[in-house]
A protein has these predicted regions:
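A glycine-rich helix N-cap at a beta->alpha junction
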Residues: 131-145
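Hydrophobic, small-residue-rich alpha-helical packing segments that form membrane-like cores
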Residues: 150-152
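Low-complexity proline/serine/threonine-rich segments in eukaryotic and viral proteins
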Residues: 1-18
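Alpha-helix termination/capping residues and helix-transition junctions
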Residues: 21, 34, 103, 134-137
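Active-site-proximal loop/turn and secondary-structure-junction residues that shape catalytic pockets
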Residues: 114, 146-148
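Histidine-rich, glycine-flanked metal-binding segment
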Residues: 17-22, 28-74
């Protein structure tokens, strides 16, 4: 088994996925600057282990996905998104856009402050953090905008 530091942030919030073990077997894994054939064990919402080819143990009760010939990459961090909540939810919300991001392999996003109202006060930033805690399907961060009104 490769040395591996467990993730401290869930791939998805625990409320959105049932607890289960999943073994993705025989994929071409891209990680840490190299590619190799191996397997990944997911325990609940966390990556529990990464195995080189031929080292994969039998995991009782796990759903096994045969990924032979498929590529398996770490989740993408999108550091520049415009989710438009609050104020322009007809264009998108944290809930809708984070789910779309996860469907495309993005596991973390960083949202820009140009919403309505703009995220230029602690109050607006805390509102977005609380909203994401309740609705986001991905890990998140929010930029804080600078303006003439908050230069201090």
């Amino acid at each position: 088994m490769l040395p591996y530091t467990p993730l401290y942030y869930p791939i998805l919030p625990p409320l959105t996925i049932p607890y289960m073990k999943t073994l993705i077997q025989d994929a071409v894994i891209i990680n840490e600057g190299r590619s190799f054939v191996g397997s990944v064990l997911i325990d609940g919402a966390f990556v529990a282990a990464v195995y080189e080819e031929g080292e994969t143990p039998r995991v009782d009760g796990a759903t096994v996905i045969n990924a032979r010939g498929q590529w398996l990459l770490p989740g993408v961090i999108d550091d520049h998104v415009h989710f438009r909540e609050p104020g322009m939810t007809h264009k998108g919300t944290i809930a809708s856009e984070s789910r779309a991001a996860v469907a495309g392999g993005v596991t973390t996003f960083m949202d820009m402050p140009n919403t309505n109202p703009k995220t230029v006060t602690r109050r607006e930033w805390e509102w977005k953090m609380a909203r994401a805690a309740d609705t986001s399907a991905a890990n998140y961060a929010f930029y804080f905008g600078g303006s003439d009104d908050n230069a201090d």
